[in-house]
Amino acid sequence: MTTVLLAACQEQDVPTLQVKKNVIFDQVKTVNYPHSDEYTTDNAQIEVRGELSETGIKWLDQLLLKHAYTLVGGEDSMKKDTPTKQDLVQKFQQIHDEFVQSAKEDRVLGASFHLTSNYLGQRNNIITFSNDIDTYTGGAHGINVTLFQNIDSHKKKILELNDIVKQDQQSKLKEVLWNFYTNLMEEANDDYIGMITKEDFNISEQFYFNNEGINFVYPPYALRAYAYGNVVLTAYWHEIEDIINPEYNWKK
């Protein structure tokens, strides 16, 4: 998915960003197995790679580092308020070592974990990054998810759903997104819609802003078959102007 966010100079308390994408971990190991006619290969390749975006702005880099650390380390990592880059490297190393150990114990086709970091753009006080996480631990294909970080540079925090739409207004947002989804599926004549009920439908916590509205991103399998990848549902500005926090309304 390609996202273009326009940079604007007014009301910014950070300069136009010069973002560097750094590879902080990249290890590949081959685990060899005794030859067997039952298998098509006699080895498994283990790949773990991690990227981190850096801006040169201390508070922003720490926020991005902590978020990446949480993505890689899981719930336990949330207890660490100020992880270092070395802490993140150790988490990648742990994933790599666990993959290798698992491959030695059980014959596998391979395993991989890739964390990619992308700078999407800046508009006034909103700075947007994304992380793509690709994992493969066996089977016909791996899994890819895209996670967004919309950072308010005034508040120095990553925005959550409750920041942009109050909880008591989210049922209206859900209705808007559900209508977009059903129209999308009907136009595509996609019978996958029968597998998702309105009661089971939720507002994705992954979103990004653009000139059309707020785009909510759902991972493969959540709303459509795997082959379609991420599904993006758009809440257009005119549909949500009465429920969105005015601070984050691009069309006010």
List each model region and its residues.
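Compositionally biased intrinsically disordered regions enriched in Thr/Gly
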Residues: Q10-K252
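C-terminal motif of bacterial Sec signal peptides marking the signal peptidase cleavage site
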Residues: L5-A8
